[in-house]
């Protein structure tokens, strides 16, 4: 079994829990990946798992189909924030150029996958922009979304994507924390940073992880307890 872009075995979901295989291959780029596979290809300086797969296909001299090229391009623009994150390097842009030369339509990918939102997504974003808090002494943007609000708009967790990045866009903020209450009462946390703050290290305090500037975690602590710990460690 091959696991892609899953920082921990828990992130592989029901498939990883319920299906057994003689060997597991772990292909990923997250800094916090503990290399849980029997075979591990964890390249932490890579912009995305898509870039790792792209380089493997090139090395093996396999032919790229247009559907494969499109999937790799989508993964690339998603994990680099449409080439806005610090993980973008020369090789990243060369990969994008090569995929576009194969026939990938950048405008179609960005318009239909990155810039296309549901009613619920826009409502969740509106709630975040209306209610987020800012802690100037730590330059932290913070927002908590309870399950009742999600039920009100019939929103799914996918409809909350982008909130943690949006509240980070406040010009005085250096780091953002987005907490979301799940149906079972657990708190799902997401963190982002602009500059020197290592949010992977902070997320690890709750058993989570990810990247230097983007990380996540789940916790049974209250939102106030989580916020207090985060503020102490920024």
Model-inferred region functions:
Residues 10-12, 50, 199:
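Short, well-ordered alpha-helical microsegments
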Residues 78-234:
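Hydrophobic helix-and-loop "lid/oligomerization" segment in the mid-to-C-terminal part
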Residues 16-19, 33-34, 64-66, 75, ...:
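Solvent-exposed alpha-helices and their adjacent loops that cap or buttress functional pockets
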Residues 23, 74, 202-204:
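Residue-level marker of motif borders
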Residues 20, 42-45, 194-195:
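Short, hinge-like loop/turn segments at secondary-structure boundaries
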Residues 27-95:
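Short alpha-helices
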Residues 1-39:
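Active-site cofactor/cluster-binding pocket
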């Amino acid at each position: 079994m091959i696991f892609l872009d899953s920082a921990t075995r828990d992130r592989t979901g029901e498939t990883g829990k319920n299906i057994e295989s003689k060997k597991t291959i772990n292909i990923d780029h997250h800094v916090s990946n503990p290399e849980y596979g029997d075979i591990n290809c964890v390249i932490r300086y890579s912009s995305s798992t898509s870039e790792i797969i792209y380089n493997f296909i090139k090395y093996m001299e396999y032919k790229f189909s247009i559907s494969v090229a499109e999937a790799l391009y989508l993964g690339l623009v998603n994990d680099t924030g449409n080439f806005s994150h610090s993980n973008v390097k020369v090789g990243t842009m060369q990969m994008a150029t090569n995929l576009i030369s194969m026939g990938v339509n950048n405008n179609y990918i960005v318009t239909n996958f990155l810039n296309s939102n549901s009613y619920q997504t826009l409502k969740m974003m509106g709630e975040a922009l209306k209610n987020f808090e800012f802690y100037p002494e730590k330059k932290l943007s913070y927002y908590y979304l309870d399950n009742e609000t999600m039920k009100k708009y019939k929103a799914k967790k996918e409809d909350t994507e982008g909130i943690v990045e949006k509240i980070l866009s406040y010009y005085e903020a250096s780091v953002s924390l987005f907490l979301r209450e799940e149906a079972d009462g657990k708190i799902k946390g997401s963190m982002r940073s602009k500059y020197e703050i290592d949010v992977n290290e902070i997320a690890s305090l709750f058993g989570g992880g990810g990247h230097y500037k983007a990380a996540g975690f789940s916790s049974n602590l209250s939102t106030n307890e989580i916020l207090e710990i985060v503020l102490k460690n920024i």
